[in-house]
Design a protein with these regions (language model features):
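Positively charged, polar, low-complexity stretches
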Residues: 1-90
Length: 90
């Protein structure tokens, strides 16, 4: 299973967050750099993939909630994708 580890500390600014997603998930050139586009791209994953989000408490509450919900929705839509939160680093 492929594992993609996302560090929330590298996703504090919206524009940087989408650049980070594009790099980590090797998203296509046409990726729209918004959460709807991210959802669409992740639903197209066709190999078993585990997405791990670490340091999620570095994100503001709204962003943390939106991303967690998005990854859970992707898991419900695409059986190839699993998601888990990784305990924060001290």
């Amino acid at each position: 299973m492929k594992s993609v580890i996302l560090d929330a500390k590298k996703m504090l600014k919206k524009e940087k967050m989408h650049e980070y997603f594009a790099k980590k998930f090797d998203l296509p050139e046409y990726y729209g750099k918004n959460l709807d586009a991210l959802f669409d791209c992740l639903c197209e994953i066709n190999e078993p993939t585990l997405i791990k989000l670490k340091n999620e408490n570095a994100l503001d509450g709204g962003t943390k909630e939106s991303l967690t919900q998005l990854f859970c929705d992707v898991c419900n839509e695409n059986e190839m994708v699993k998601f888990e939160l990784v305990k924060d680093e001290k």
